[in-house]
Amino acid sequence: MAAGDNKLQALQQALNSIEKAFGKGSIMRLGEASAKLLVEVIPTGSIALDMALGIGGVPRGRIVEVYGPESSGKTTVALHIIAEAQKMGGMAAFIDAEHALDPVYARNLGVDIDNLLVSQPDTGEQALEICEALVRSGAIDVVVIDSVAALVPKAEIDGEMGDAHVGLQARLMSQALRKLTGVVSKSKTCCLFINQIREKVGVMFGNPETTPGGRALKFYSSVRLEVRKVDTLKQGSDMIGSRTRVKVVKNKVAPPFKVADFDIMYGEGISREGSLVDLAVDMGIVEKSGAWYSYKGDRLGQGRENVKEFLRNHPALAAEIESMIRGRTESARLAAAAAPAAGDGE
């Protein structure tokens, strides 16, 4: 026992000296009240995607990567996250390295463009320094970088068109992420990188697709979302939107590999009503018999599009159904978080 007491005393002295040197909270036991067990989140604007992420949205204080082919809905998802952060009273920033942000579309998605900070940097270094400065301020809830592929190193911009710049962008991203990760964690900012897709040459077997910017972002990201368009939504002969599938290919805060399907309507963004209909049917909240949908014995309409329109015209009913879906999801999430703790106590 004496040897055990000596060890504990030595450990406590070490902890005290660490806290004296680096400040209180620099080292702690994981289960202490000061160490948050439930991750703080920002909703994505799609209840289906919130459920697929397992925690109700994208995590604060973490790095998130959203990637996919062109016109798949990557920027739309990012703008919805910004809109949700603003609805919660937060501040958001959009670093537009592609110089392609459409303010009218952003407003249609619910973004308060008068209070959205926007930067259109000249070089990759400038973009990442602006990002770091915003995160260090501690006043930003979400910062979006669109996109990694457009973060051009200064040496490449200053050089000639045909010059080879092997690995410059990868080195830039690796250095920036080493600096950013700790700052992002302390500030509770969600740092969201949008990325494109490239194809590796000469791949015979397996997936030839990769993302630009080296491997650093893959490692440092707590969540990676793959966004793909799977179908086109039509009304008669008119194309009115696209059916989008998001796969959670990496998740450090919940079980990964879950998939969310939702509608993105052209000019409007993610269809809230479409996700409500799909999830309510899956959970048994709304009954589907043939083409008819009913809720608590009352018919909502015939056909999915008609039910979406009905919910759009009856926001109180839509809010009630959403509350039931989120309530069940949150109960399951809290039960999953409490299960290991209950097991430890036995």
UniProtKB/Swiss-Prot annotation:
This is Protein RecA. Belongs to the RecA family. Keywords: ATP-binding, Cytoplasm, DNA damage, DNA recombination, DNA repair, DNA-binding, Nucleotide-binding, SOS response. One of its GO terms (biological process) is SOS response. ATP binds at residues 68-75. PANTHER family: MITOCHONDRIAL DNA REPAIR PROTEIN RECA HOMOLOG-RELATED, RECA. Its main location: cytoplasm.
